[in-house]
């Protein structure tokens, strides 16, 4: 629909100059727009596009983002791991999930990342690792 097209076009254009943005709140606004575009792309099952938006959103975050922008960071990282799982690109999932595990404030915030990581291990036929992680989560 037209609203989706406008969102994707606007975010694509803003991303072209995103790394040049030096003002923190403007940069975080663009990261939020990438999250919105990523969420919308996930809902439309365009997982490659979703991963691209989410990865760009992550790249816009500052070094102390987990402290200052916890909710945004958690959403970007968790959804990026999910998008990469849907794309069958498993190499980044464990690294992204490790970031969530390290910085999550509460156990519930880790669950989505654990679920994606367990599914990714299973999809790679690393069933023993998937089961071990499942038991660890329990």
Regions inferred by a protein language model and the residue ranges of each:
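Extended alpha-helical scaffolding segments used for macromolecular assembly and cargo binding
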Residues: 1-120, 124, 129-137
């Amino acid at each position: 629909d037209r609203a989706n097209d406008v969102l994707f076009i606007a975010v694509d254009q803003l991303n072209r100059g995103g790394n040049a943005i030096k003002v923190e709140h403007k940069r975080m606004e663009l990261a939020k727009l990438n999250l919105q575009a990523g969420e919308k792309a996930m809902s439309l099952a365009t997982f490659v596009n979703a991963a691209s938006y989410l990865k760009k959103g992550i790249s816009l975050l500052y070094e102390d983002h987990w402290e200052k922008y916890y909710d945004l960071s958690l959403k970007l990282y968790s959804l990026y791991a999910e998008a990469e799982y849907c794309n069958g690109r498993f190499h980044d999932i464990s690294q992204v999930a490790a970031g969530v595990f390290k910085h999550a404030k509460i156990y519930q915030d880790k669950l989505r990342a654990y679920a994606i990581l367990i599914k990714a291990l299973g999809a790679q036929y690393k069933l023993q690792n998937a089961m071990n992680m499942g038991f660890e989560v329990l």
